[in-house]
Amino acid sequence: MAASVELAAHIKAHPAAYADSMARKVLFMVFEKPSLRTRVSFETGMARMGGYAINYDTSTSPLGAGKESLEDTIRVVSRYADLIVARLYKHTDLDKMAAHSSVPVINGLTDLAHPCQILADLLTITEKKGDLGGPTLSATL
């Protein structure tokens, strides 16, 4: 986790060095739960790094209407996208996505965890405190 926080700090300090790091890459975003910060963060990050983000609105899609299975949707989507981020009601659905995807799936939030928020919080602590050493941190769900 510390390596991820260090990389995030480096990207934040030197954005020009990463301007093309996602060139020609496509991020597919599946958000069952509405989001402002998570969605904008991923879309902005992809744009600033030269990639593209596609938002899939489950409320108006065959998946959301129950006409297409999650497994089939992800199998198809992972043929087009390089990366998937999912913000879902059930963590078990995230597990299904990961099992049926041929590309990495990022947990953008589930009923079990919000790891991207944890990483953002750890980056903030590092920026304010200088490192992650010291008191033990814990979170309640």
Q: Across the structure, where does each feature detected by a protein language model lie?
A:
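Electropositive phosphate-/nucleotide-binding environments in soluble metabolic enzymes
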Residues: 1-8, 36, 40, 67, ...
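Anion-binding alpha/beta catalytic cores of soluble intermediary-metabolism enzymes, centered on
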Residues: 74, 82-141
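Positively charged, low-complexity intrinsically disordered leader regions
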Residues: 1-40, 44
